[in-house]
Structure formats: structure tokens, C-alpha cells
Amino acid sequence: MEPTAPSLTEEDLTEVKKDALENLRVYLCEKIIAERHFDHLRAKKILSREDTEEISCRTSSRKRAGKLLDYLQENPKGLDTLVESIRREKTQNFLIQKITDEVLKLRNIKLEHLKGLKCSSCEPFPDGATNNLSRSNSDESNFSEKLRASTVMYHPEGESSTTPFFSTNSSLNLPVLEVGRTENTIFSSTTLPRPGDPGAPPLPPDLQLEEEGTCANSSEMFLPLRSRTVSRQ
């Protein structure tokens, strides 16, 4: 169900018309001849005879028009009656358009203001939802910190290691807790240099002598075999 559009009350419309007269005061004081509208305004009970006499006491046309606008602002129907009088005169219809445009402009501004107040008063979440959301975020943060603290382990070197889901190196796809076993496997499968290879440690003296003796007699060990093979043929 769509929300209803805001509407202006009678008080709002009266305020709009009063503001329109105030905004156009300088312009209307130059264009309006107050005496031309006395009869119609008195017939509609907008002005009294005393009011017209008070207006007529002003020394200039602009001052008389200004005093007339003062009386019209005090009456909720003052502006409407002035427009009717101008229409009856048929000589200043451009004033009607000017007044109408100003009233419509102020009316739209008032409606936008009321619409903004209505939107700001609407709660996007149910009562207490914002508090519950902030409380939930706080609980999750506390739980995460506690979980992180409970899973941290320290190696002899002082390096810290956390559980697999806190590991930042996801490309390895290896649990952090198994790093030690993985390293052991790598080191155990690496081939060590053999005696005599570059980088191999020197052999003890007794092993060197034994190895040299073995190499010197290797040809003699195979001679009897070859001699026996030849004799059989």
C-alpha cells in the first residue's frame, strides 16, 4: 500500500497566501491602486469603512497600497478577494498571473517540506532493531577476538601461528597446524651428499684408510672370477 501524499491544511494555505503577499509587496505597491478595490473589499467584508479611511490617510499611492496589503494579510480570504477585484477591473490581469505563480511556488515548497518531515519520521527498522543490530555486531566482534586469542600458539622462536581459517596464505591450502610435519617430511626426503661429493664432510681417518684399501684391491677381487671362467671354457 503506497503512502498517502501530504496535503496542506487551511492554516497552511493561509500562511502560503500571507507569504506570497509579503514576497510581492514591493511589486504590488507599485502596481495596485488601492482606491479601485475599496468597494469590492467592503462588499466582501474584508475591509470596513474605518479601514478604507485609514488607508486613504496615507500620503502616497505606494503607502496606500502597502496599508491595503497589511489588512489583506490579516484576513485569510484577503488575497483571494483582491484577485477577484482585479479580475473585475479587467485592466491588470497580469497581476493575477504574477500572484498565482507566487502562490503555487510557495505551495510546492510547503508540500516538499511536509513530505520531508513525513519521510524523516518513518523508521526503516522496527523498534529496537538498530540496537539489536549493533549489539549483535559487538557480540560477533568479541567472539572473534576470544576465538583468535584461544587458538594462538607460540613456537620456541617466538613466532605465532593461528588456526587454519585465520591463515592468510590460502594458495598453499595446507593447515597451519601441520607446518611442522610438512617441513619434517621435506627434510627427510632430501638426498644428502655422499662421501666425496662437493659439500660432504670429510670421513674419519680410519674410514678413509678402509675405503682406499677397498678401492686398491677391487681389481684383485675380480681376477679369480675371470680366471675361473676362462678355465671352465
UniProtKB/Swiss-Prot annotation:
Limits of the CARD domain: 13-101
Places the protein is found: Cytoplasm, Perinuclear region; Membrane raft
GO CC, alphabetical: CBM complex; cytoplasm; cytoplasmic microtubule; cytosol; immunological synapse; lysosome; membrane raft; nucleoplasm
PROSITE patterns given in the database record: CARD
Keywords in alphabetical order: Acetylation, Adaptive immunity, Apoptosis, Chromosomal rearrangement, Cytoplasm, Disease variant, Immunity, Innate immunity, Isopeptide bond, Membrane, Phosphoprotein, Tumor suppressor, Ubl conjugation
Impact when changing E53A: Abolishes cell death-inducing capability
Any GO MF annotation of the entry: signaling adaptor activity
Impact upon substituting G213E: Found in a MALT lymphoma sample; uncertain significance
InterPro entries in the record: BCL10/E10, CARD, CARD_BCL10, DEATH-like_dom_sf
Effect of K31E: Found in a MALT lymphoma sample; uncertain significance
Site features described as Cleavage, chain residue numbers: R228, T229
UniProt tissue specificity: Ubiquitous.
Outcome after substituting T52I: Found in a mesothelioma sample; uncertain significance
PTM note: Phosphorylated. Phosphorylation results in dissociation from TRAF2 and binding to BIRC2/c-IAP2. Phosphorylated by IKBKB/IKKB.
Superkingdom, taxonomy of origin: Eukaryota
Post-translational modification Phosphoserine, affected residues: S138
Recorded consequence of changing K63R: Decreased ubiquitination and ability to bind NEMO, impaired ability to activate NF-kappa-B. Decreased linear ubiquitination and impaired ability to activate NF-kappa-B
Pfam families attached to this UniProt entry: CARD
Outcome, altering L41A: Abolishes cell death-inducing capability
Subunit-level organization: Homomultimer; homooligomerized following recruitment by CARD domain-containing proteins that form a nucleating helical template that recruits BCL10 via CARD-CARD interaction. Self-associates by CARD-CARD interaction and interacts with other CARD-proteins such as CARD9, CARD10, CARD11 and CARD14. Forms a complex with CARD14 and MALT1; resulting in the formation of a CBM (CARD14-BCL10-MALT1) complex. Forms a complex with CARD11 and MALT1; resulting in the formation of a CBM (CARD11-BCL10-MALT1) complex.
Disease implication from the record: A chromosomal aberration involving BCL10 is recurrent in low-grade mucosa-associated lymphoid tissue (MALT lymphoma). Translocation t(1;14)(p22;q32). Although the BCL10/IgH translocation leaves the coding region of BCL10 intact, frequent BCL10 mutations could be attributed to the Ig somatic hypermutation mechanism resulting in nucleotide transitions.
Role noted for this protein: Plays a key role in both adaptive and innate immune signaling by bridging CARD domain-containing proteins to immune activation. Acts by channeling adaptive and innate immune signaling downstream of CARD domain-containing proteins CARD9, CARD11 and CARD14 to activate NF-kappa-B and MAP kinase p38 (MAPK11, MAPK12, MAPK13 and/or MAPK14) pathways which stimulate expression of genes encoding pro-inflammatory cytokines and chemokines.
Designated name of the protein: B-cell lymphoma/leukemia 10
Organism of origin: Homo sapiens (Human)
